Amino acid sequence: MVLVTTRRALLRVLGLLSTASLAGCSAIDSDPKPGSLLVVNNDGVPHTLRLDISRDSETRRETVDIGAGEWGLRNELFTEPGTYEVTVRLAESDGATATTTVEVTETTGGGLTGENLEVYIDQEGSLRAVTRRYD
């Protein structure tokens, strides 16, 4: 399930996250965790994303709905250590595709460290998928 809100709320949360990171605090629930998915829809229409996630020769499909001009964060998309090959497509378009690799490792304490997946839908429905490291 993706939490959806407005751009104004996203800017407010990003400001809080910046303040929290400067203060050394990571207790904010909307803070992206390693293995999470952040979707930002900068387009003026809602979209459905199809994610094909492959690891160790097994593939699973996830579907994410995101409203026009909204964003959503889903922690725990990648819950096991490993290298994930991810292909993202707009369900309503055959052409818009983005592919990237997400690395997640296990910490000595049993938690996860590594990257999260960020997907940006730009105006007119073009896609970007990038990874960002969170420890």
Where are these regions (language model features)?
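Hydrophobic alpha-helical segments
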Residues: 1-60, 64, 72, 82-92
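Generic detection of short hydrophobic beta-strand segments and adjacent strand-loop junctions
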Residues: 62-66, 74-76, 98-108
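Surface-exposed, short loops/turns at beta-strand junctions within beta-sandwich domains
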Residues: 78-80
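A general structural signal for short secondary-structure boundary/capping elements
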Residues: 82-87, 96-99, 133-135
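Structured interaction patches on ligand/partner-binding surfaces of diverse proteins
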Residues: 91-125
